[in-house]
Amino acid sequence: MENLTQNVNETKVDLGQEKEKEASQEEEHATAAKETIIDIPAACSSSSNSSSYDTDCSTASSTCCTRQGEHIYMQREAIPATPLPESEDIGLLKYVHRQHWPWFILVISIIEIAIFAYDRYTMPAQNFGLPVPIPSDSVLVYRPDRRLQVWRFFSYMFLHANWFHLGFNIVIQLFFGIPLEVMHGTARIGVIYMAGVFAGSLGTSVVDSEVFLVGASGGVYALLAAHLANITLNYAHMKSASTQLGSVVIFVSCDLGYALYTQYFDGSAFAKGPQVSYIAHLTGALAGLTIGFLVLKNFGHREYEQLIWWLALGVYCAFTVFAIVFNLINTVTAQLMEEQGEVITQHLLHDLGVS
């Protein structure tokens, strides 16, 4: 009897503990429901219609309905935090906050202004009335008869015919060069600018082989063409691509129209000044476009852009190699003809009895 009484008491204790446990669980669920329920559907709050409950609760966005006894609890599903994919936009954001100070464009502009001012200050008085007051024997002028002085293919960019020529190039290279350098960096823009300058003198040496050359227009047009390369590579990631393209087209159109007007329709003394080297502009732009495809940052790689890269490399290398070989052959030929001419002249003078 004592054992039976003890078993009954233990059973009562167990039942009491289970009831207390169930009560505590219900309180916990009720508290959790208050904290997690957000915009509970009407069907989820009604327990009278089971089919309606199942249908409506299954359509609740990112929620889960459960029954426990007489109560219905709404709990949000745990949505795992998935890492963002390495998309093109994320690749672009890596560069947005890494902007570069435009050292190259600012420094090259200051140097060009300083050299122009120095030339004007030290210029002989008789040169001020000339259309191009720069002396032809300057060590910076590109001269076709001194092609072996290789620095002249670059140094001519520091000289300008007049204040208008200088100011025009400075304004344009600041306006178009600074945004490119801020985004793509000093080294890339420096390479593009110098490639345009070099291409300008190379192209002139091939097409207008007797022309002297001054001015930084080859580098300026390289920057303009680099904008086209940048737009082609990163159009989908640029907010003002159409505006940039329009500004380049407007500038080139105005510059070309002004050059044609002054050459063919304007009879003023200003129009009779130094002629514009269209070849330097064109070859500078070609260099800027091809080198731009090669060195500018590409924020979204696509399959066809690899083909553009190789095509640009091939075009630039072919043009450069052809121009260099042409200059070497032309220079050697000219020297041989000059030496042969001197020999022939000496023979003629000897035959005529003139020492």
Swiss-Prot record:
Disulfide bonds: none annotated. One of its GO terms (cellular component) is Golgi membrane. Keywords: Developmental protein, Golgi apparatus, Hydrolase, Membrane, Protease, Serine protease, Transmembrane, Transmembrane helix. Its EC number is 3.4.21.105. It comes from Drosophila melanogaster (Fruit fly). This is Protein rhomboid. The keyword Nucleotide-binding does not apply. Gene3D superfamilies: Rhomboid-like. InterPro entries: Peptidase_S54_rhomboid_dom, Peptidase_S54_rhomboid_met, Rhomboid-like_sf, Rhomboid_IM_Serine_Proteases. The active site is at residues 217, 281. Its main location: Golgi. Residues 1-10 have a biased composition (Polar residues). The keyword Cell membrane does not apply.
